Swiss-Prot record:
Coiled coil: none annotated. PROSITE patterns: RIBOSOMAL_S8. Part of the 30S ribosomal subunit. Contacts proteins S5 and S12. One of its GO terms (biological process) is translation. It holds the Pfam family Ribosomal_S8. The keyword Ribosomal protein applies. Keywords: Ribonucleoprotein, Ribosomal protein, RNA-binding, rRNA-binding. GO terms for molecular function: rRNA binding; structural constituent of ribosome. SUPFAM superfamilies: Ribosomal protein S8 (SSF56047). The keyword Cell inner membrane does not apply. This is Small ribosomal subunit protein uS8. GO terms for cellular component: ribonucleoprotein complex; ribosome. The lineage of its organism: Bacteria, Pseudomonadati, Pseudomonadota, Alphaproteobacteria, Rickettsiales.
């Protein structure tokens, strides 16, 4: 059976791994997933990720980040734009998520980026997910 929303599957795996206090989580790799992981790493929500090959299939292994107290660096990670209902936003309509403590991840004509970077470049796009 094929999956209809690979990004939502990745976000769910990350969320469940944090709830289970796992150190790593892996899932099938794709360009959009790796772009989202680049943003998460740049914003400091994950440690690192590595792309590996197994039986000619690419997998991404993500090293999750915890505080010294053992608390997860991601409290909430949710899909906003879904295959059945795409959500687009101009940059002026995006207000700070959790009083600028969280981020929106957007797919723009200039690539996948956080809302902070999109404000600097003054570009809107599809709101992929929100992270806090």
């Amino acid at each position: 059976m094929s999956m209809t929303d690979n990004v939502a599957d990745m976000l769910t795996r990350i969320r469940n791994a944090y709830k289970s206090k796992l150190i790593n989580v892996s899932f099938p790799s794709s360009k959009i997933k790796n772009s989202i992981l680049d943003v998460l790493q740049k914003e400091g929500y994950i440690k690192d990720y590595v792309i590996t090959q197994k039986n000619n299939i690419s997998y991404t292994k993500v090293a999750l980040k915890y505080s010294i107290n053992g608390e997860a660096s991601i409290c909430e990670i949710r899909r906003v734009s879904k295959p059945g209902k795409r959500v687009y936003s101009a940059i002026k309509d995006l207000k700070g998520y959790y009083n600028n403590m969280g981020i929106y991840i957007l797919s723009t004509p200039y690539g996948v980026m956080s809302d902070r970077e999109a404000h600097i470049k003054n570009v809107g796009g599809e709101v992929i997910c929100k992270v806090f």
